[in-house]
Amino acid sequence: MQKWWFTHNNRSIRRKSTIKMRIVLAALVLIIAPALLWGLIDIYRSANGRPCASFEEIKQKYAVSDAALLDRNGEVIHTLRVDVHGRRLDWTNLGQVSPSMVRATLRVEDKRFYSHGGIDWLALVSATFSNLTHKNLRGASTITMQLTSILDRKLRPRNGSRRGILQKWNQLKAAVSLDNHWTKDQILEAYLNLITYRGELSGICAASRGLFNKEPSGLEEAESLILASLITSPNASVEEVAKRACRFASPVSRNSIRDMAYKTLGRPYHIRRDASIAPHVARLLLTNGKKESKCTLDGNLQRYVHASLNEAVRFLENQNVSDGTALVVENKTGDILAYVGNSGTSPTTLYVDGITAYRQAGSTLKPFLYELALEKKLLTPSSILEDSPLEIVTPTGLYVPHNYDNIFRGPVSVRTALSSSMNIPAVRVLGLVGVTDFVERLQELGFKGISQAPEFYGYSIALGSADITLYELVNAYRTLANNGRFSNMRLVFDGNRHHAQNILDKKAAFLISHILSDRQARSTTFGLENHLSTRFWTAVKTGTSKDMRDNWCVGYSDTYTVGVWIGNFSGEPMRNVTGITGAAPVWLGIMNYLHRGFTSKPPQPPGGVQSAQLTFEDSIEPPRTEWFIAGTEPAGMVLVNRVHAKPRITYPTQETLIAIDPEIPQHLQRVPFRFEPQSRRFTWTLNKEKIGTNDSVYLWTPKQGVHELAITDEDGHILDSVTFLVR
């Protein structure tokens, strides 16, 4: 009896509990059902509401992280990273994504994407039940829902936590609205372009190129599964990504997918830039948030110049050459057509812009010195200069210039001296022109680095002791090509022509161009066959700075000016490299490339310039037809001493102190007495006693004491005298 009573009582209790549970559930249904119904109505009512933006607006607002530099023809010649917060490449249309990538994305993220209306209710209910029972925590966000949180910042989780109920609710509403206004393909295309795959790689193009070095259209199944498996957790470990990818792969491909995941994700990503030939111009122009900028460069020419420079520097590596730069400009417009600031051969100097770096000018400034002398009518192309030993007393000591080859050629014409780049005649010309006037002229030509007082440079500026840039030098030579008219060069089409002003006399500029184009005149130093000789008209000058640290070649045709520098950005000297062997071959190659379809014609003589037939005294140079500024042409034969200064003793100078070397027997020591010009007949006297006649250099055995040295002419008149001390 007792057992029956307990059994009956338990059944009664269970029945009552079941009834209560049903009542509670019924109550919950009665309470929740209207709420759910209201919620569903609210969600689908939002379908008529406009989403945060249209597909076209999102695509238009999309910004790549790399800005593009376009050449004059619209070709992308360089891309430059301008956004450091994410790596985004070009927007990829859905049709440009491989089918395997589309399938993998849908399989991993949203297998019923094309059948639901923005919300996968089946997945949502299943995920809710799993989360409530704690069996398997998972999400149920569709591709559409994920996209809404990308498009609307308010729908994203805050501070790394999960979304709140209200935020999730708004996401559901936004997904339905988006699905109602966008096509499925538009949603999927935007999703693939906006999601983050790995680290800073955002969008399918950056992920595909960064991880697999291929365009999205070329992605294969294994690569696609790895990328799709990154979406849920972009920064997950390689092991987690590989495990997730294998879960969606066929059994036979899992090992290869795992190996690929470890190989691909276990190394830093790298995006290869096909367009990377103008880095220095890109850094100049792609500023202030610009995503695109068109410049004056010619892409094909830029590639050729860079390749030529790179090849030349590598060829000279054994002569301690590491770097090179080149600049090409159109004479008439000032458009810069090629700007190669670095040959790219030295990894330690890849970011150095050698075009704007200051280097010693060498002989490249001589044409402007001679132009000023011609302009002032102090000289003509046929004037005779003495190429002989020279010593100049300066406030800082004795200045003794030398020719590059240490050969003295005696009397030479201005044409020969400039074309053959003789140093001592150039210093003599500077003595005629004046250091101050020459420095001021260089400043007028845009040499901003020449900013010190004239006395800072002294006579050495004639031989290029001043620091200049290739940019400044090319524009100065372009001024010669434009008959003396100076204007700024340009890298962008700004719509305005830069104002031109007359800096050089057009008649003198014509004479300089004629001299620099004279193959015969330059043969004295360089020979007839060299890298300065072109099959069309060009005017060109080389330069080499002290200790072979800088190597220049700058010249122009009727259309283009080209400048090349070879050397070391570190300042180390080269070994046995001159302008004719270093920079000139590159210059010649560029000129030939520029004129492969047409020729270059010599400039027409301007008004006020005329030619005349002339001969030289003692036949120091062959007879020729020479050009002159009207009124400066010689009457008949050119005399050797036409432009000589007053005869003088060049060594020792006044009050020179000479010390006898105690280590060397006195009778073996010699002091050279020097005099110029050498063409005169004269007599050496020391302490009023005759010691020699017509010796350009007299070697004297020194004796202690104060001595008076003089030179006298045939009539005994003192031409020059100095007092010096020996101790």
Predicted features along the sequence, with ranges:
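Non-catalytic, structured segments within soluble enzyme domains
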Residues: 35-39, 136-306, 440-454, 459-464, ...
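Soluble, non-transmembrane domains of envelope/secretory-pathway proteins that act on or interact
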Residues: 2-4, 8, 13, 28-38, ...
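Conserved catalytic neighborhood of penicillin-recognizing serine enzymes
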Residues: 130-158, 269-271, 276-284, 332, ...
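Active-site loop and adjoining helix of the penicillin-binding protein/serine DD-peptidase-beta-lactamase fold
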Residues: 175, 231-249, 289-301, 346-391, ...
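Short, well-structured active-site flanking segments
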Residues: 114-124, 202-205, 351, 374-394, ...
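A penicillin-recognizing enzyme superfamily signal
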Residues: 295-318, 327-330, 339-342, 346-360, ...
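A short, well-structured edge-of-sheet supersecondary motif
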Residues: 66-80, 97, 319-348, 440-445
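Beta-lactamase-like hydrolase cores
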Residues: 43-64, 220, 299-330, 415-418, ...
